[in-house]
């Protein structure tokens, strides 16, 4: 309970600090953009893995499995160019380290995507060119080891309560119906691929492999017809909802995407009160990262985030001095980003409303909330063990007492029966 009270007090302190700052802040001349957070998926890549009967194994791909392709590099360079145009006048036209901070998961494809993106966002100008023949400059991308990443690599674990929720999700009518409807289809796919452990939760790997091969001009096997690919795609999208929704979505969010959302909320609050962060904060990650965050925000469209798709948070200071948050999702390269509205708030969402509406899906103490609560059955077991332990303890004490008394009798002493002759 102490951890919970301290969590609520921190949230209340953020609200109080923000409110006090807004009361004393003088009005600005015009509405202005103050801070941007980007979360994007890596670009086009090779398959993460293959299946036993696949004629195309790892050697088919120049850099092996799970690696960014030239197409993926171009996708992120183009996204960087689009961001450069969108934030012209907000960001300096040349790279300034005080303005930008980039963090990536520790995967080759996300690190390289961030580097390609920065090449499009900040081509070197003038003195920044270290070679006149190279229109590129090194810009730092920060990361942590995969095993230590508690911000961008989802699903987060180990988390016993989340695993319990997943087991409960498997018992829901929606999951059970989906499983029964696709039982024969999964058997067919398992037979064609040579996979022995194919389930609703793992079939996305088959779709991913076939999709990557098709994208790169490789011929698919006859069984992978357009109808089969469409069905696999739908099951792939179902697997994302299984991870972060279907059942107890809000609690799953607290254990998953809400962790990242908590950091984004802190950054927005900090920039509205002290302006002590870079103007642009970038996260380079995965489709699961985007889905986890968008499910926590309740703005997920139910489909896998495309390569180089980008979720945008923009913090504005209004002419009144108050702050607002706008969200966008760029999931098509040839169109402007789609406006996203947090449920219960207009697209131009006042910052305090944004914080209030997202509070329920932000964990107060992730480690504590991940623990399993003791139910009635657990209590009965504990009581029974305690009773048995007490009885065993008393028996041991009684036995030791008897043994002690027997050993305490003097040598040669024996009881004399009535009527026995004395020597």
Curated annotation (Swiss-Prot):
Coiled coil: none annotated. Its EC number is 3.1.3.2. Residues 402-423 are cytoplasmic. Keywords: Disulfide bond, Glycoprotein, Hydrolase, Lysosome, Membrane, Signal, Transmembrane, Transmembrane helix. One of its GO terms (biological process) is lysosome organization. This is Lysosomal acid phosphatase. The active site is at residues 42, 287. The chain crosses the membrane at residues 381-401. Its main location: membrane. Glycans are attached at residues 92, 133, 167, 177, 191, 267, 322, 331. It catalyses: a phosphate monoester + H2O = an alcohol + phosphate. SUPFAM superfamilies: Phosphoglycerate mutase-like (SSF53254). It comes from Macaca fascicularis. GO terms for cellular component: lysosomal lumen; lysosomal membrane. Belongs to the histidine acid phosphatase family. The membrane-bound form is converted to the soluble form by sequential proteolytic processing. First, the C-terminal cytoplasmic tail is removed. Cleavage by a lysosomal protease releases the soluble form in the lysosome lumen. The keyword Cell cycle does not apply. GO terms for molecular function: acid phosphatase activity. It is found in: Lysosome membrane; Lysosome lumen. Residues 1-30 form the signal peptide. It is a single-pass membrane protein. Residues 31-380 are lumenal. Disulfide bonds join 159-370, 212-310, 345-349. Pfam families: His_Phos_2. PANTHER family: ACID PHOSPHATASE-RELATED, LYSOSOMAL ACID PHOSPHATASE.
């Amino acid at each position: 309970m102490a951890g919970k009270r301290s969590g609520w007090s921190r949230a209340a302190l953020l609200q109080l600090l923000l409110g006090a700052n807004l009361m004393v802040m003088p009005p600005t001349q015009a509405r202005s953009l103050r801070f941007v957070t980007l979360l994007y998926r890596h670009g086009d890549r090779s398959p993460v893995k293959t299946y036993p009967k696949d004629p195309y194994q790892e050697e088919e791909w120049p850099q092996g499995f799970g690696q960014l392709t030239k197409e993926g590099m171009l996708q992120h360079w183009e996204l960087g160019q689009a961001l450069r145009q969108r934030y012209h006048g907000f960001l300096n036209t040349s790279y300034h380290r005080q303005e930008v901070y980039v963090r990536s998961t520790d995967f080759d494809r996300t690190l390289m995507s961030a580097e390609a993106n920065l090449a499009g966002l900040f081509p070197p100008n003038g003195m920044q060119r270290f070679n006149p023949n190279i229109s590129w400059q090194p810009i730092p991308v920060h990361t942590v080891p995969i095993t230590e990443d508690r911000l961008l690599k989802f699903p987060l674990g180990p988390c016993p309560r989340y695993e319990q929720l997943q087991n409960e999700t498997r018992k829901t009518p929606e999951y059970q119906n989906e499983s029964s409807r696709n039982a024969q289809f999964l058997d067919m796919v398992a037979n064609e691929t040579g996979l022995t452990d194919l389930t609703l939760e793992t079939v996305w790997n088959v779709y991913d492999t076939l999709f990557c091969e098709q994208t790169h001009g490789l011929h698919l096997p006859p069984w992978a017809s357009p109808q089969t690919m469409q069905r696999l795609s739908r099951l792939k999208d179902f697997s994302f909802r299984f991870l972060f929704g279907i059942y107890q979505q809000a609690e799953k969010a607290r254990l998953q995407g809400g962790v990242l959302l908590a950091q984004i909320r802190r950054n927005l609050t900090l920039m509205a009160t002290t302006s002590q962060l870079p103007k642009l904060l970038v996260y380079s990650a995965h489709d699961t990262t985007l889905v986890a965050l968008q499910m926590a925000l309740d703005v997920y469209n139910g489909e896998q985030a495309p390569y180089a798709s980008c979720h945008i948070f923009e913090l504005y200071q209004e002419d009144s001095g108050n702050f607002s948050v706008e969200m966008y999702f760029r999931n098509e390269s040839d169109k402007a980003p789609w406006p996203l509205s947090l449920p219960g708030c207009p697209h131009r969402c006042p910052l305090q409303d944004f914080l209030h509406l997202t509070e329920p899906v932000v964990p107060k103490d992730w480690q504590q909330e991940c623990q399993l609560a003791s139910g009635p059955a657990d209590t009965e077991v504990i009581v029974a063990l305690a009773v048995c332990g007490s009885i065993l303890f008393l028996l041991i004490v009684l036995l030791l007492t008897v043994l002690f008394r027997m050993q305490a009798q003097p040598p040669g002493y024996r009881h004399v029966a009535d009527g026995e002759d004395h020597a």
